[in-house]
Amino acid sequence: MKLYKAKNTLSERHVQADRTADAKVPDDLWRTCPKCQRTLFAAQMDEYATCPGCGYGFRISANQRLSWLVDSAVPMDTALQTQDPLNFPGYEGKLKKAQEKSGLNDSVWTGRARIGDVDFNLGIMDPTFIMGSLGTITGEKITRLFEDATKNQRPVVLFTASGGARMQEGIMSLMQMAKVSTAIAEHDAAGLLYIVVLTDPTTGGVTASFAMEGDVILAEPRALVGFAGRRVIEQTTHTEIPADLQDAENVLKHGFIDHIVTRQDEKTTLAWLMKYGGKQND
């Protein structure tokens, strides 16, 4: 069988065979850690989706995190529906696609949860939903989460993962920063505990508001934590910044984070903090 044509090029038959073989290989068969560049066989990764080399936690959905984080959970405000107040081109289609992919009505899951004998209110931002962007329904759900916790004297745990305010909703998206912060202040005034867990990525308006307002601020290893992105900083300052400038470990070193916790330890750490660091209900 002739492999090459006269001009020393692969025959069309072999090119087509290569394309057919490539099409049979799943896109998610291999994963590359964005931090240490280690190539991982996806099927060998555990339920926590962490890199065995550097501990980086890959971006996961809210439902994936729920599966190993809590013993039980009941969702809240699932009927709220995101609108398109500015008639932004293509936004409705993007929303529908994100809702189908994530199974959520917007970029955050909220509800009442339990770990062991500790009851608390839980919020998990989902980076698979338009990169966890902060929209009006996201802000409304988190606000209601804190209001419910204040009313029922419960601590709140919030996992942040966001690219910032959602541009398709304009100023109404930015308003959520102040609205959520007000609900947090009322929760704090009631003497209740608020724990934040920063995951990759936590940036923009979320970092500038409720992500940094916790009584205890935890972070996952190697998580990106910052306000503006690396490229924006470098273009604005005309200075090349260190590769690890916005890594959680560096943010911890400068005092903005209290502790870094692996996903494997999050459940026990949160239970301990809420049991001994928060107001107890009789």
Swiss-Prot record:
Gene Ontology biological process terms from the UniProt entry: fatty acid biosynthetic process; malonyl-CoA biosynthetic process
Superkingdom assignment: Bacteria
Protein's recorded name: Acetyl-coenzyme A carboxylase carboxyl transferase subunit beta
Purpose of the protein: Component of the acetyl coenzyme A carboxylase (ACC) complex. Biotin carboxylase (BC) catalyzes the carboxylation of biotin on its carrier protein (BCCP) and then the CO(2) group is transferred by the transcarboxylase to acetyl-CoA to form malonyl-CoA.
Enzyme class (EC, first level): transferase
InterPro entries: AcCoA_carboxyl_beta, Acetyl_CoA_COase_Trfase_b_su, ClpP/crotonase-like_dom_sf, COA_CT_N
GO annotations of cellular component type: acetyl-CoA carboxylase complex
PANTHER family listed in its UniProt record: ACETYL-COENZYME A CARBOXYLASE CARBOXYL TRANSFERASE SUBUNIT BETA, CHLOROPLASTIC (PTHR42995:SF5)
Compartments in which it is found: Cytoplasm
Domain CoA carboxyltransferase N-terminal: 29-282
Keywords: ATP-binding, Cytoplasm, Fatty acid biosynthesis, Fatty acid metabolism, Lipid biosynthesis, Lipid metabolism, Metal-binding, Nucleotide-binding, Transferase, Zinc, Zinc-finger
Source organism of this protein record: Limosilactobacillus fermentum (strain NBRC 3956 / LMG 18251) (Lactobacillus fermentum)
